[in-house]
Amino acid sequence: MSRPERLQPGVKLRDADKVARIPVKVVPSERETMLRKPDWLRVKLPASSQRIDDIKKALRKNELHSVCEEASCPNLAECFNHGTATFMILGAICTRRCPFCDVAHGRPLKPDANEPKKMAQTIKDMKLKYVVITSVDRDDLRDGGAQHFADCIREIRLLNPSIKIEILVPDFRGRIDAALDILATEPPDVFNHNLETAPMHYRKARPGANYQWSLDLLKKFKERHPDIPTKSGLMMGLGETNDQIAEVLKDLRAHNVEMLTLGQYLQPSKFHLRVERYVPPAEFDELREFAESIGFTHAACGPMVRSSYHADLQAQGKEVK
């Protein structure tokens, strides 16, 4: 057997190339076997695309990335049209190969030291009042990228003193305590880390991740910052049952997580994990009611809900679905 080619820095691997060496092989889906999208998942495009074009131009001008584009989010048009975007720092190449995600895999470049200042200025120019910052996984960095998060938060607040900042962080595998020490110097207004799915599906959906580590990350942050809301998100449609999701919600509450997002998984390409079922809106409503009954202060549950979808409204406690 020939040895796999060494990854070249900055080269993006997608689709079949991305998932070629994960533990549970993904069999490409044939179009005729893929489930047909139900009517409740039809996305309405805005009448005008000017605002969308303006945000894309601002991102390109400042060499910034949005997870909206890199992960092919179905809500991109709606969010960009409302003047909101989720910034993705530390480049657009992830060191993981999660087969549900459309972000490219590969060997990332060195972090851009100017990114925090460029992001702060862009946010000021866009007159944003609430911003979500996320990142690719950077297992190649000693701190997993924690210092870059802290630098971004600091620079954003210097130019935008009244802004609210939510961070959606990776799992900082093997360096949770060190990462939290760094983030304690510039804590966010909301701390978010997604569990993504039930633990029995981690091997196929989140290779390289660990369910308990993710729970521990959320709990340890909350222990350090009891006044800062913690948040997590899950996808449905990967083969889990509603009872399994309910158990995850109980685990999240046992680890002091207060905010929840729950949405429908959509298959980015035939090379990604297939959608096992489309969950009806009524079932999302039932899970939202269950989440609220066990103590979540806010639960955004619906087919099109994503972690940062109307995150500003989520933080205000308003209904999002």
Curated annotation (Swiss-Prot):
EC number(s) per entry: 2.8.1.8
Keyword set, alphabetical order: 4Fe-4S, Cytoplasm, Iron, Iron-sulfur, Metal-binding, S-adenosyl-L-methionine, Transferase
GO MF term list: 4 iron, 4 sulfur cluster binding; lipoate synthase activity; metal ion binding
Main location: cytoplasm
Name of a matching Pfam family: Radical_SAM
Cell compartments where the protein resides: Cytoplasm
Cofactor remark: Binds 2 [4Fe-4S] clusters per subunit. One cluster is coordinated with 3 cysteines and an exchangeable S-adenosyl-L-methionine.
Record pathway: Protein modification; protein lipoylation via endogenous pathway; protein N(6)-(lipoyl)lysine from octanoyl-[acyl-carrier-protein]: step 2/2
Ranges for domain Radical SAM core: 80-297
Record's catalysed reaction(s): [[Fe-S] cluster scaffold protein carrying a second [4Fe-4S](2+) cluster] + N(6)-octanoyl-L-lysyl-[protein] + 2 oxidized [2Fe-2S]-[ferredoxin] + 2 S-adenosyl-L-methionine + 4 H(+) = [[Fe-S] cluster scaffold protein] + N(6)-[(R)-dihydrolipoyl]-L-lysyl-[protein] + 4 Fe(3+) + 2 hydrogen sulfide + 2 5'-deoxyadenosine + 2 L-methionine + 2 reduced [2Fe-2S]-[ferredoxin]
Keyword DNA-binding in record: no
NCBIfam families: lipA (TIGR00510), PRK05481.1 (NF004019), PRK12928.1 (NF009544)
HAMAP family: Lipoyl_synth
Family: Belongs to the radical SAM superfamily. Lipoyl synthase family.
Protein name in the entry: Lipoyl synthase
Lineage: Bacteria, Pseudomonadati, Pseudomonadota, Gammaproteobacteria, Alteromonadales
